[in-house]
Amino acid sequence: MSLDYNTCVTRYSDQFKKILIAPDYLQKIQELASRIVERKLTEVHHLVDRNQELKRFITGLMGEAALEQLLDINIIDWTVGDSYHYHYPDIPGYKVGIKTVERNKFPIIFKKNWYPQIICIRSDKFENLVFVCGLATPDVLNEFQSDDLIVDPALRKRGTKTGFYGFSRLKPVSGISDLYSYKIGSK
């Protein structure tokens, strides 16, 4: 199956929410990302996967910042530590993660997903622009995936992650009420 970005992503872009991140907040994000990357130099799996690491952390944090604005909650964890301390969903109090990717790339996800992800795209034209695309349920994440979307051969070889292309099945996210069914402790 051939998957191209325009067919899988761009054709749905009129449904995405545009979020501008303030320049001073973007600067704080860049500084945090630098501290994180410096700390990751001590972790073996980060020594193996050094390609564009600073840019990836900035991109991920920008998605979190965009959702902070959209949902009017604090999301970014400003602490720096070992990766194993950070294996939990991104949105505090909710079983919801955030996947942010550069424009013209597909989000990389785990092959088996247990909680939803809000998918975001970082603009390639404006440094501080993020598109909030929508929420992918675990069923959607687990169905619409392809290893062919992984560009990095080393990551593909590890076999734990895959590319996501189910933008046609994303649920819109306009506010925190859209996530209530994923609130920790709710039935």
For each of these PLM feature ranges, what is it?
Residues 1-92, 99-187:
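Nucleic-acid endonuclease domains
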